[in-house]
Amino acid sequence: MRLSSRFYLFTSFTAWSVVIAGATPAVCGAPEYIIETQNDLDVLSNCQVVNGSIIMNTSSATSLNFNRIETITGDLIIRNNNYLASVALTSISSVGGELRFEKLTRLASVYAPQLANVGQLTMRILPNLQGIRFDKGIKKAHKLTIEDTQLSTLAGISLNTTDTMVIVNNNYLREVDMPYLESVESKFYVSYNAREISVTLPRLKTVGDMTIQRVAHLQLSNLEEVKGFLGFLNSTLQDISCPNITRIGQSLFFIGNQELTSLNFKQLESIGGTFMIANSAALAQIKGYDKLKTVAGSIDFTGNFSSVELPKLRDVKGGLNIQTTSSDFTCPFRQSDGIIKGKSFVCRGSVDNPRQSKESSFDDDDFDELLGNGTIKGSKNSTSPVKQSGAAKVDSRPFRLVTFFLVLVSGFAHLL
């Protein structure tokens, strides 16, 4: 074991010399402990509290047991090991910094029955991880990232609030059930997990940015405010119901939801960016926005719908593009009524090939730079089969480009 600071209380040879007989808890203090083997870890077996971080970066260990340690005030990071099959955090109840498991190709199980609080939980590129045991339940984590695992459930992760939640490229994950989650301050992304995945967030009230991609079942009945953008992409949802949302700070978009037949946003009053619906062939009517008054960006609807009902809409600061194949469509807007403030005004039916606005085309690299790895398309380092699938690439690319436009235009709507 190596200590990374010149100032420390003990070395690997005398770790127990500072433990005073009968004193509880036994506290070990050094900014960072670098471990490579179970023997290195055993040196800390008399420490109940580690005031610092424990890091394993490359190792050939096949299993790790953290024995008597109960609290780590810094980070616990285990990564870059092709042999490690199991990790037991038997007594650990709290990790003040980040708990990270990353690039552990054989890791099959994580056992942490007492763990309740972490600063940040990251589980990335663990292609054989099928089991996690968080028996007590993780109730606090500022950031949660679950990416490229074989987990089928996130049972044992039961947050009340968090800053960021990213759950992507877990091909066996069939449910994201967070019954007590009430707020996500920054980002909530669920993308490219099992096709039949169910996302249940019955108490969620506020969120920053939210992207729901390739989801089969969704529960957002209590959602009241989205501070950033809200997007539903490539899902098999038949009904999307957010009956209590009153405000969306940036864009709202529905793209590639081929089985979608109904929308319910009956309390929504304002959208701070673009409002887009595209590639949703089963959506025959666009309605369910009884109180929508203002759209700070543009309206861009394309599809097969026969009607658009926005009865309270009075102000669209951007342009209008409504194109449908239906011959029964009658445009609900007139350029002379003053509702549409932008320069572009397209609103017609019987269109053979409805097209989105020209502004929807952006370079794919620009999109990746904006949203980063592991949000819509997954991480560059991901081993997930989804990333390698040609079908997935063909299916998702145009929608990723459109999403870039939506996020960008929400900040520049006044220029349209």
UniProtKB/Swiss-Prot annotation:
Highest taxon of source: Eukaryota
A GO biological process of this protein is: ascospore wall biogenesis
* Entry-listed glycosylation sites: N51, N57, N160, N234, N244, N304, N373, N381
What name does this protein carry? Meiotic expression up-regulated protein 10
Question: Which purpose does this protein serve, as stated in its record?
Answer: Required for the formation of the mature spore wall, where it is needed to ensure correct localization of 1,3-beta-glucan.
Task: Give the signal peptide as a residue range, or say none if absent.
Answer: 1-29
| GO CC annotation | ascospore wall; cytoplasm; extracellular region; prospore membrane
| Places the protein is found | Cytoplasm; Secreted, Cell wall; Spore wall
User: Sorted alphabetically, which keywords does the UniProt record give?
Assistant: Cell wall, Cytoplasm, Glycoprotein, Meiosis, Secreted, Signal, Sporulation
Give the originating organism: Schizosaccharomyces pombe (strain 972 / ATCC 24843)
Q: Which InterPro entries match?
A: CWI-Assembly_Regulator, Rcpt_L-dom_sf
